[in-house]
Swiss-Prot record:
Protein name: Putative molybdopterin biosynthesis protein MJ0666
GO-annotated cellular components: cytoplasm
Species classification: Archaea, Methanobacteriati, Methanobacteriota, Methanomada group, Methanococci
Family: Belongs to the MoeA family.
Family matches, as InterPro entries: MoaB/Mog-like_dom_sf, MoaB/Mog_dom, MoCF_biosynth_CS, MoeA-like, MoeA_C_domain_IV, MoeA_C_domain_IV_sf, MoeA_linker/N, MoeA_linker/N_sf
Domain of life: Archaea
MF terms (GO), sorted A to Z: molybdopterin molybdotransferase activity
Biological process annotations from GO: Mo-molybdopterin cofactor biosynthetic process
Annotated keywords: Molybdenum cofactor biosynthesis
Pathway: Cofactor biosynthesis; molybdopterin biosynthesis
ATP-binding keyword on record: no
Length: 398
């Protein structure tokens, strides 16, 4: 059995891939300015800073009466303070103005007495509770101060971001705008639409594998807010693969090829890419996902991913997802011992609770482990594992 020699350290491979991706995005201006409603679920290509304070005026946080707090000092149920009702944009000492949640405070007002502690009679109001300055008031800049970063470059834009952006008067933002072609290779693959009834057709498959990787990769790309197109399966034929690669790259910004990345006679992907362009990375010291490849054809990035689902998902996470998005990280104790082998980085799928538990299922193709995992741990190449109770960094997937 042939082995990939001279495996590249993960950090070195990531650095190379990320630098090439950055160059491609910068040189080809793969950034698009869109209306904020079109930005939902896409990746921000810039830091957005608040152009104003939010709120930009002092406003009532409760229904009640806007007052000058000092007027209420000493007020109680047995000793109410009586204030005259005002009806303008300004109050003076001895006055109060009826106000509703979200209303702008009148000039000079610095507190709100909740309506439950007031009794309005004719043109005055009895106040039964002392309030302090800024009580029941949302102050200028309390939510966001001018200059605060409200959306970071690399964040996926969610509905709450849209609320914030609209509140700040921001109508358009820049997002990454990319399209990925997806090609699956291998004589052993068949298309999903060739299956009428899996229970009836299972005996006819004769060891064939349904092309499921394309659907997973399609979903991963779409989750980043990018466009994706699945191409027909390409058998283990170099000329047919060349033709498919040329077509996909003519229609997309980048290409994902899954399968054929190892070094057996049937693994033709890396050699084919090399004949069409440059292979910059092939073989990384990670498990699963060792036979990862990255190349450039006609100045466009080509990712060569494993045919095994878990390995392919890991490679996508490490070399594409992590370039665009910074995963949230938590530190938690391990529920049980976790072994590793020196000289490689182990990507361990885990379940996350008050402790983190490695998923026992192993292998590069075990699909269920992807569904069950909430996050992952990266065990460095110089660590032989972790012991139960040891604190570890967990990257969250959900």
């Amino acid at each position: 059995m042939k082995l990939i020699k001279n495996l590249m350290p993960l950090k070195s491979a990531e650095k190379i891939v990320f630098e090439k991706l950055s160059e491609y995005l910068d040189e080809n201006k793969k950034v698009k300015e869109v209306d904020i409603v079109e930005a939902l679920n896409r990746i921000s290509a810039e830091d957005i800073k608040a152009p104003i304070d939010l709120p930009y005026f002092n406003k009532a946080a409760m229904d009640g009466y806007a007052v000058i707090a000092e007027d209420t000092f000493g007020a109680s149920e047995t000793n109410p303070i009586i204030l005259n009702l005002a009806d303008g944009d300004e109050i003076t000492y001895g006055e109060a103005k009826k106000i509703f949640t979200g209303d702008k405070l009148p000039k000079n007002a610095n507190a709100v007495v909740m309506k439950e502690f007031c009794n309005e009679v004719d043109d005055f109001v009895e106040v039964y509770k002392t309030v302090h300055p800024n009580e029941n008031v949302s102050r200028i800049g309390e939510d966001v101060k001018k200059g605060d970063v409200v959306l970071k470059k690399g964040e996926i834009i969610n509905p709450y971001h849209l609320n914030m952006l609209a509140s700040l008067g921001i109508k358009k933002i820049k997002v990454y705008d990319l399209s990925f072609g997806i090609i699956s290779t291998g004589d052993e693959l068949i298309n999903l639409d060739e299956i009428r009834d899996i229970e009836e057709d299972i005996s006819k498959l004769d060891g064939k594998i349904i092309n499921s990787n394309s659907y997973m990769l399609y979903g991963l790309v779409k989750n980043l807010g990018f466009n994706a197109k699945i191409y027909d399966i390409v058998k283990d034929d170099k000329e047919k693969l060349k033709k498919a690669i040329k077509t996909a790259l003519s229609e997309n910004d980048a290409l994902l090829i899954t399968g054929g990345t190892s070094v057996s006679e049937r693994d033709i992907t890396v050699e084919t890419v090399r004949e069409l362009g440059d292979v910059i990375v092939h073989g990384v010291n990670i498990r699963p996902g060792k036979p990862f490849g990255f190349g450039i054809i006609n100045d466009k990035p080509v990712f060569m991913l494993s045919g095994y689902p878990v390995a392919s998902a890991v490679q996508f996470e490490l070399f594409i997802q992590r370039f665009f998005i910074e995963r949230k990280k938590v530190t938690l104790p391990l529920k049980r011992n976790m072994a590793s082998e020196l000289g490689r980085v182990d990507f361990v799928r885990v379940k996350v609770d008050i402790e983190v538990e490695p998923i026992r299922i192993t292998g590069s193709g075990v699909i269920s482990s992807l569904i069950k995992s909430d996050g992952y741990i990266l065990i460095p190449e110089n660590v032989e594992g972790y012991e139960k109770g040891e604190l570890v960094d967990v990257y969250l997937l959900k």
